[in-house]
Design a protein with these regions (language model features):
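Membrane-interface soluble catalytic domains
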Residues: 1, 9-17, 32-40, 50, ...
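Long, structured stretches of catalytic cores involved in phosphate-ester chemistry, encompassing
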Residues: 363-365, 387, 433
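Histidine-centered active-site microenvironments of extracellular/periplasmic hydrolases
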Residues: 194-198, 377-421
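Transmembrane and membrane-interface helices of multi-pass
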Residues: 1-141
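A long, amphipathic alpha-helix that forms part
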Residues: 28, 152-166, 302-306, 340-383
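Short glycine/proline-rich turn/loop motifs
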Residues: 227, 340-348, 420-424
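Active-site-proximal alpha/beta segments of enzymes that process anionic O-linked groups
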Residues: 134-339, 413, 435-467, 472-475, ...
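Short beta-strand segments
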Residues: 258-260, 316-323, 353-359, 382-387, ...
């Protein structure tokens, strides 16, 4: 039974220390003494543990980020997620349930009644009183679910009126502003930011400004972008859906567009789709017939071209890519691998850096089209690329993956690159920029003036932000895991 309790905690992402194991063991031993308590408490509890175990052994206990991701995930992503869990993980539920039933069978058959041993019960009580709880898994799960549920209720029930008021434009140079959001693209896996293999020929050489030092608002798409695309509460790291990026741009009388390969509008609005829905025009590849398809980011290019050619009005276009989303090998089914890797251990990293190469080519194609339009019709433009968050390494069955199974010191490091129709030189800035100031940076880039915006803030001044709002302390408290990018050259 000791080993079953240890397995339960390990698979729930809870530290299986001897103390925690004995606490869970005490709970099971006492409750199993009663037939009703076993069937109505122990069995349901262990069933929930076992169901989560294939995932928990890799990703740890549930939290806001993971629960929010579930609400924001479509059928295809769930299917991909489950197929990439190692087969051996699916045996853990069998081991857990079998262990519980074998223990129950043993004590019933041998008529063992621990509850009659008062000395043993006293020891159990004293040991249990010294803090810690085997119910931590359920506390974390319930708290995370309620937090996400409450946010979804807010997003779906109120008409999120804008609190920006009126904005005006000042030194707004371009006719078209294009914001490209990459997915799960860690900065140090870009050649433009130092990775040895040249998987970013466009960003590495094109005229523009490369900013080395931007940090994300969170460790996954929802937790990051809900802060970066609103004017957040800096102290508590909470979004403000009354002050969204789209509402800010619209307050300056700029036409807004949102093009995405990140899923469709479902029954529930996620924080990101709620922001996207505020746009004047929305287009999602994974909607209707695309529901179950692994769609390529390149399919967005034709829609962008259509929008640019359709009118001459000033436009703000958000392009949300699928990029290097988890299970990166599925992202490059239609694309060449950038390296020849013989060692299976590094095969996934090859997929990952190839997916970044694919994103770089997307940017190159988009920029080439915009330059042609500028040459023909004088439609000036500026294109800004960043990624929502990074990933961490995790070795499973002899293969090194990149996913959100843990938090890395490099998890929040993301790329930022800007180019435009009048970029005549190349500049690189090495300066810390907090993702929580992102909306101020976007406003400066476009030339939007608003009393709620810091008019002096800029992505491109090569100056460090004075405050990281606790990010460094948070990373220091949550992880000591350092996992720099792995060079797969010659592997």
């Amino acid at each position: 039974m000791f080993f079953t309790a240890k397995l339960i905690l390990k698979c729930a992402g809870i530290l299986p220390s001897e103390r925690n194991i004995f606490l869970l063991l005490i709970l099971i031993v006492i409750l199993t003494s009663s037939k009703k308590a076993f069937w109505f408490l122990v069995f349901p509890m262990c069933t929930l543990y076992s169901i989560y175990s294939p995932i928990g052994i890799i990703y740890g206990p549930p939290n806001y980020s993971y629960v929010a991701s579930v609400f924001a995930t479509d059928f295809l992503e769930i299917k991909e997620f489950l197929t990439h869990i190692p087969i051996k993980n699916y045996f853990y539920p069998i081991f857990i349930i079998s262990g519980i039933f074998l223990y129950r069978f043993f004590i019933v058959k041998n008529n063992i009644e621990f509850y009659k041993n008062k000395t043993l019960i006293s020891i159990f009580v004293i040991f249990s009183m010294i803090n810690q709880s085997p119910a931590e898994f359920f506390k974390i799960t319930i708290r995370s679910i309620l937090e996400v549920k409450n946010e979804i209720v807010v997003l779906n029930n109120f008409k999120s009126s804008s609190e920006w008021g009126r904005s005006h434009l000042e030194n707004s140079k371009y006719d078209n502003y294009i914001l490209v959001i990459g997915e799960s693209a860690r900065k140090d896996y870009h050649h433009a930011f130092g990775y040895p293999i040249n998987n970013t020929p466009f960003m590495s050489s094109n005229n523009g400004i490369l900013v080395n030092g931007l940090t994300s608002g969170g460790s996954n798409t929802v937790s990051s972008l809900r802060l970066m695309l609103t004017k957040p509460d800096f102290k508590n790291w909470k979004p403000n859906y009354h002050l969204t990026l789209i509402d800010l741009v619209k307050s300056a009388d700029i036409k807004t567009y949102w093009l995405s390969n990140q899923g469709y509008f479902g029954y529930h609005d996620t924080p990101i789709s709620a922001i996207a829905k505020k746009s004047d025009y929305k287009y999602f590849l994974k909607y209707g017939d695309f529901y179950s398809k692994n769609t390529s980011d390149f399919l967005l290019l034709d829609k962008i071209k259509e929008i640019i050619k359709k009118s001459k009005e000033k436009k703000f276009i958000v392009v949300h890519l699928y990029g290097s989303h988890s299970h990166a090998c599925d992202r490059v089914i239609d694309y060449k691998k950038i390296a020849n890797v013989r060692d299976k251990k590094y095969s996934y990293i090859n997929c990952y850096i190839s997916s970044i190469n694919k994103t770089d080519e997307f940017l190159h194609k988009l920029n080439s089209f915009m330059m042609k339009e500028f040459s023909k019709n004088q439609g000036s433009y500026s294109m800004l690329y960043f990624a929502d968050h990074g990933l961490a390494h995790n070795e499973t069955d002899g293969v090194i993956y990149l996913n959100n199974s843990r938090v890395s010191k490099f998890h929040y490091d993301i790329p930022l690159f800007e180019t435009s129709s009048d970029s005549s030189s190349r500049k690189e800035c090495y300066s810390f920029k907090s993702g929580l100031n992102f909306i101020d940076g976007i406003a400066k880039w476009i030339g939007i003036k608003n009393e709620k915006i810091n008019k002096n803030y800029s992505f491109f001044d090569c100056k460090d932000d004075p405050n990281d709002y606790g990010l460094r302390n948070y990373i220091a408290k949550t992880t000591d895991y350092t996992d720099p990018a792995i060079d797969i050259s010659g592997k």
